[in-house]
Every structure is written in C-alpha cells, then in structure tokens.
A protein has these predicted regions:
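Acidic-histidine catalytic/liganding microenvironments
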Residues: 56, 195, 260
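Auxiliary Fe-S-binding modules of radical SAM enzymes
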Residues: 116-238
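Hydrophobic, helix-prone linear segments
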Residues: 36, 93-96, 190, 195, ...
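General structural signal for secondary-structure boundaries
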Residues: 36, 82, 173-177, 181, ...
Length: 298
C-alpha cells in the first residue's frame, strides 16, 4: 500500500522531489504489486510506472472521497483536487487497464451522509468504472483534531452542533453511537447492492499476489466486514487478527488451528478451505448476496 488514512504520498511537494515516483520505481524493479491510495490526481504522472507494474504483477489505484459533490468537498476537503477531477482520474486509469477503487470515507454526519449524497457517490463511482468501494463513517476522538473539526462545524454547519453531541456522546475511541452506525450501514448497503459494486476488493484482484497467510487473513476480514454490514455479530475479525500475528506458514499448523485465539469451529472450516482451494465458499456466498460475481475481474 502506497498512501494511508492519515497521510498522502502525493503531497504538493511531490511535484518537486518525486519521492513517491522513486518508490514506485523500486516497487517495479523488485517485482512487487502496489495499491496506491490518494486524493491527488498527480498520480496520473506516474501512469508509466504503474502500467509497468501492472504488466508483471498488479497495480491498483484508489482515490478517497468524503463526497462527490464539488461544493461540499471544497468545505470538508480543502486544498485537494475536486471530486470531479478524481473521478476523471479513475476513468483515465481504467482506460489504461488498471483496477481502481473508491474509498468513500469518512462519511460525515449531517454533511455527506444523506441517502441522496450516498447514492450520488455510488452512481458516479459506478459510472467511472470503479472495481470496488470501501466505505466507512467517521470517528471523532477527543483531542486537537476533534476540537478543530467541531470548530469547522460551528463555522459552516452550526445547526449540527447538537447532533454531534448526541452521535459522539461517550465513546473513548470517538466511535458514533451504534444506532447511527447501523442505520448508515443499512442505507449504504441497500444503495450499493442496487449498483452491484463490491464493498471490498474482489478476490480476483488479490488472490494471485498474496501468500497463504495473508490470503486467509484478507478473506476472514472480508467475511467479518460483510457480516457486520448486515448487522450480524462475527467471530471472524478476531480469527483474522490472531492469524495475522503468525510468522510461519499457516499450512504447517492445520492440526492446531483451534489452539489459536479467536479461531473456533466455523473459522477453522473457512481457513482449511482457503488453504486447500484458495477460496472460501462462505465468503463467495456473502459476496453473491451483495450481487457480485466473486470470480469476475470487474
């Protein structure tokens, strides 16, 4: 992964120093796959290297959005390329044969979380040809960032102050109250099913570039997410975390999987199937419930 949730590899200074471009060149030279996450359309500059990576391994380019509305974005995402520019960049990379994702996060309560704006985002992403959408609401942990954000809310959306006190009332980690999160997830889930856009990266984009441990962890995490998006409880997240901490190949531990924290009978069955076949029928069943053909490279 080149990029992240709290920093962008394509800062304006990248135009001058080209550190990210040089990092991509190393990725190419060593034969690694790469997934770029950014808000910047400067990534188009590096299409030559990304195409080269995609020839020998896999290159994926994702853009993050809080909204696809240019006017709203100018307030909540100042000093970054507009959503329209980012959607055009997705179209460009898709025309090059490079898979693309939308990271629709954080969705901001009272600002970008209405059903209308969520549907606009999914519709425009689908129209641009995205291969998947990663979705999340917003956390608001106590500290400087929360103080800054609440100040911006007072300046631009003063009517929302009481809503934020209700939604972010008491969580140590800044998580919204469950009734808000559950409602938001149900709304988004209903919309994205209509457009048949995957809400996690499709297996065809990662199965052939991951080792066995990582493949198991990714599938378990996706199962966990898909179940929680349906409002169900899930043990698969704990199993995924436990397995992610194991340095040795998982295939050598087949007889002792149940000794791992969080791995019960159901998770063990999934793990053994993935080790045997490279896929999980339960995972595929959940993906099919989203209207997605798991084996298709979208």
């Amino acid at each position: 992964m080149l990029g992240g949730g709290v920093g962008d590899s394509y800062q304006p200074i990248e135009k001058k120093y080209q550190l990210t471009r040089r990092a991509l060149q190393l990725v190419h030279e060593f034969g690694f796959p790469v997934h770029v996450l950014t808000k910047s359309v400067l990534v188009i500059r590096d299409a030559d290297i990304l195409n080269a990576v995609n020839q020998h391994s896999r290159a994926i380019v994702s853009f993050s959005f809080s909204s696809v509305d240019d006017r709203t974005s100018a307030v909540v995402e100042p000093r970054v390329p507009s959503p329209s520019e980012r959607l055009d960049a997705i179209r460009f990379f898709k025309s090059q044969g490079i898979a693309c994702g939308m990271f629709l996060l954080p969705v901001i309560p009272g600002v970008t979380d209405s059903p209308e704006l969520l549907e606009e985002a999914v519709a425009k992403a689908s129209g641009a040809g995205v291969d998947f959408i990663i979705f999340s609401g917003m956390t608001l942990k106590e500290g400087r960032q929360k103080d800054y954000f609440i100040g911006a809310v007072r300046d631009h959306y003063p009517r929302l102050a009481a809503d934020y006190r209700r939604i972010y009332g008491g969580s140590k980690w800044g998580e919204p109250v469950p009734e808000y999160s559950d409602s938001l997830n149900r709304t988004f889930g209903a919309i994205v099913r209509r457009y048949k856009v995957p809400i996690r990266m499709p297996p065809a984009l990662y199965r052939d570039v991951l080792g066995e441990n990582d493949l198991v962890v990714v599938i378990l995490e996706q199962i966990d997410y898909l179940l929680r998006m349906q409002g169900q409880r899930s043990p698969f997240g704990r199993a995924a975390y436990s397995i992610s901490q194991i340095p040795e190949p998982l295939s050598g531990l087949k007889g002792g999987l149940r000794d791992l924290w969080g791995v019960g009978e159901t998770a063990e069955r999934v793990v053994l199937e993935v080790l045997e076949t490279g896929k999980s029928s339960y995972h595929q069943q959940l993906l099919a419930g989203q209207g997605i053909r798991p084996e298709a490279r979208l």
